[in-house]
């Protein structure tokens, strides 16, 4: 490991010791799978149907926190790439997403053992569109580089860069908090990665409000600060975010990136009764919502969707986009034709009455 990193970590340790002394003187997603072999054949020819169409609509980009990253307000979740969406299908999904204006892709080093990143890297190389694509990936869950220790972070980032076939990561998430590692050590490691040009910005996933506050205090010493937070948030799962986490995110100006935006597919209307459920992983997770509350939410989504001549999925994402600090919900597609409903959400403006109705039925 380059010498700059351990030197910086020693500086952090010194700051931590000084802070301790001062205080004493004054008396607070798909599970990881084994990697799958990578095909070597070229990408499928660009869909001729896409060549005859343009973007769905003109949508203003949104900025991610205090950064220069401007993104379409929908992040394409890549956890299904190489899993429920095979390699060729994944590439066609990416083509459709990009052609209709999408530029923000969310992945992780642990998704399908790194296969998701491999497919994204292959697509960017063949299409020559790396500069126009904002790539977010996460570290901390891959079985070869677990946790947020310095060595794990550096090795994980190097491996992601190789799979993505790029020199830099636009937005690096800590996939989960790691209570076994001092947060300042993890931040110092990312500082070195930023100085090296391998990472542009840092974000947090699945962090508590208290830990976000701690991280912001540490950033006052010159360490990198989080510019975004990713958390589970949708019409069926609200309380976790609509608490101290929302208050802290707003106070810190963090861009909020809700994952499971469609509640494992439930908010698309695919699972309306127990008869619609099957044995796949998404269906099993969605089963928790097949109840009276879920039926009320789907009925409201159907009504609002009819008023906008849209779909329940688009309305569910539009509801998120109307919430303060939400920049780009994360949603995935297992077929190319599903992409349109995801992107269409950014062009929908819900009325106050519609927002109140959706808020009420989902309480």
Pin down the residues of each PLM region:
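Structural motif
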Residues: 100, 163-164, 197, 252
